[in-house]
Amino acid sequence: MTTSFEELTDSYKCIFFDAFGVLKSSAGLYPGVLDRLRSLRERGKEIFLVTNDASKSPHRMVEAYSHPEAGPMFPLERIISSGLLASDYLKNKVRSGWVAYMGKDAASFYIADVGLHPVPIGQLNLDEHSPKALVLLDDEGFDWFDDLNRAVNLIRQHNIPVVVANSDIT
């Protein structure tokens, strides 16, 4: 017996969609995604986008998951990213100072947004910065050999938390 998407979703008030690979690929939205999302909303379902993409701010995420004619598929408050979870950890546990990070410059949003001072691992100078944490935000935007070596040495020599916001790195 096959269960339809509608029958399956009837059992739930809230539905979480993984972002990349579920709603779209590098080629764009999968066929039928907009109709499915619209149908769920019409049926009173709360829908959220969940992603481990910490390479861009939530506002950029809204843009990335927008359709040229239909507009944003998810409003800002319905996007849950690993970057937001990293920000929350930093806000509650680190609270002040420098935070070294690995990833694109745009990913540093998640550090700066909570009042901390981001420094790319490749620019970290321990004479000038005393990082309170290391955050892995993206698998791009750094030199894999030199910067990964710097990160390993940093956590080997300093007892600081390591926050892994994008598991694609590990």
Predicted regions and their residues:
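HAD-like aspartate-dependent phosphatase fold
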Residues: 1-170
